[in-house]
Amino acid sequence: MQIGNITINGKLALAPMAGVTDLAFRHICREHGAALTVTEMVSAKALCYKDKKTPRLLELGADEHPAAAQIFGHEPDTMAEGAKLALEKSGCDIIDINMGCPAPKIVNNGDGSALMKEPELASKVIAAVVNAVDVPVTVKFRKGWDEKNVNCVEFAKMAEQSGAAAITLHGRTRSQQYSGTADWDAIREVKQAVSIPVFANGDVAEPEDAVRILAHTGADGVMIGRGSLGDPWLFERANALLETGICPALPPFAERIDTAVRQIELAAEQKGEHIAMLEARRHVNCYLKRESGVKTFKNRICALTRLSDLYEIADELKAFVSAKENI
């Protein structure tokens, strides 16, 4: 797939998720077959105001290419300057504009999916960013604001006309947030309406879902979000299913929990042990989502403060699951 002058060697991408797709998790997902990764969203205004914490969210791994940096905002000039800074600080291959985030604190500022209610302003934002950077610009948005205001087809056409090199459509409205089901028919309509690459997003939790959404929508790729939490193998298993028609099994539990530990070790290297442990409480428990009888372990994980505690819990978990499997 070509996004502007950037070649994406695969159909599966890791969606940007605030508080989730940090450098460590992106590294793990890329190891397991994600062809494109995207940073957590960063505020263009924060970049312009020289906020000290924001640039850290844009750090890419040494071999993390192709990768996109995602920015959000609604002021064309600020977004243009923010895009330049994001490119400068990250060395990314693509700038992605967030026009889909449904969070109240984002929408109430006129950012994220609020821009779907103002397509003329959204067009100015896209054009400003396209003119500001020399890398391809992509846009991620939703089906519409609510079921009475579904405008994804028109919005997609506008994005293409404004210079976007590719788009991602999450098949839910803003009012749905993450509830209900994603409308894959809407994604198909968008794909048929534009000539630039389209990533389908929404309700891909298993390898078979990736195959189905591509077949249903005709999209060029799949942007996988929440389904990848605790399951980076979703990428390699879906890739195998797409290429061979055969879906490999998940690796043994011991390998999965070791991967969780390595993710947190990588996070600790980047952010320090304290922050990594706070974030581990969510991440590690996601790796246990397929396991039964581990509530006690989950409670202990929610109180993690040190890597040494994580190592101890991981060893106990492996012994517990092994014993359970041998009954």
Residue positions per predicted region:
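Alpha/beta catalytic cores of nucleotide-metabolism and tRNA/nucleoside-modifying enzymes
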Residues: 4, 8, 12, 18, ...
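Alpha/beta enzyme core
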Residues: 80-111, 119-196, 216
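Glycine-rich, positively charged N-terminal anion/phosphate-binding segment
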Residues: 2, 17-93
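Active-site beta-loop-alpha junctions enriched in small/polar residues
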Residues: 17-19, 42-44, 72-74, 100-102, ...
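Hydrophobic faces of well-ordered beta-strands that scaffold small-molecule active sites
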Residues: 12-16, 37-39, 67-71, 95, ...
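N-terminal small/glycine-rich loop or linker at the start of catalytic domains
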Residues: 1-13, 47-66, 101-111, 130-138, ...
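Aromatic- and acidic-residue-enriched carbohydrate-binding clefts of CAZyme catalytic domains
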Residues: 116
